[in-house]
Swiss-Prot record:
NAD as UniProt keyword: no
SUPFAM superfamilies: Cysteine-rich DNA binding domain, (DM domain)
Function: May be required for testis development.
DNA-binding region of this protein: 1-29
GO terms of biological process kind: cell differentiation; sex differentiation
Main location class: nucleus
Entry-linked InterPro entries: DM_DNA-bd, DM_DNA-bd_sf, DMRT, DMRT1-like
Cellular component GO terms, alphabetical: nucleus
MF terms in GO: DNA-binding transcription factor activity, RNA polymerase II-specific; metal ion binding; RNA polymerase II cis-regulatory region sequence-specific DNA binding
Coiled coil: none
Assigned keywords, A-Z: Developmental protein, Differentiation, DNA-binding, Metal-binding, Nucleus, Sexual differentiation, Transcription, Transcription regulation, Zinc
Record's protein name: Doublesex- and mab-3-related transcription factor 1
Cell location: Nucleus
Length: 205
């Protein structure tokens, strides 16, 4: 009978004090989560972590410049004065080509580590359980584009530039469906579009 008639917030017995303490801890956890969510929202538009990437670019470019200078100074020892200009320019070009991908890859990795929070934040907006047909429409549009560009690349005659494009585009729609059932997919997508629009109207009001 104590449980039914007791005000557990004001009661001093062991059981009620434990319940009150647990409620306080849960409220503190909820407050912490809200604060973290607000900090993440502010962190999206916060410009503080961004300048670290340009600094890396500058450092990497400086390193690349010094290595080019080293190559220029070492190349005249191996060749004559007439061949120095010919030997230094290709080494410069090669060093720059080698340095540029490493710069972009490093900057990309650091920027993605900053953007991991953003992806989780944006994923909370999109709920695929409410609109199960919405994802199919996006897949269908990508598949349609891939088929169009695939046919255009095959018209090129299988050139060197067209073949990697073909392979990359073919791997993209392969996860969604096979190319044989294209007409069936088209029928399904039109039906799902109607169903999605009616469902979307129901939810929007």
């Amino acid at each position: 009978g104590h449980k039914r008639f007791c005000m557990w917030r004001d009661c001093q017995c062991k059981k009620c004090s434990l319940i009150a303490e647990r409620q306080r801890v849960m409220a503190a956890q909820v407050a912490l989560r809200r604060q973290q969510a607000q900090e993440e929202e502010l962190g999206i538009s916060h410009p503080i972590p961004l300048p670290s990437a340009p600094k890396l670019f500058v450092k990497k470019e400086n390193n690349g410049g010094s290595s080019c200078l080293l190559l220029e100074s070492s190349s005249p020892t191996h060749s004559t004065n007439t061949a120095t200009t010919a030997s230094t320019t290709p080494s410069e070009g090669r060093m720059l080509i080698q340095d540029i991908p490493s710069i972009t890859s490093r900057g990309h990795l650091e920027s993605t580590s900053d953007l991991v929070v953003d992806s989780t934040y944006y994923s909370s907006f999109y709920q695929p359980s409410l609109y199960p047909y919405y994802n199919n429409l996006y897949n269908y549009s990508q598949y349609q584009m891939a088929v169009a560009s695939d046919s255009s690349s095959s018209d090129m005659g299988g050139t060197l530039a067209g073949s990697p494009v073909k392979n990359s585009l073919r791997s993209l729609p392969a996860t969604y469906m096979s190319s044989q059932s294209g007409n069936q997919w088209q029928m399904k997508s039109t039906e799902s579009r109607h169903a999605m629009s009616s469902q979307y109207r129901m939810h929007s009001y």
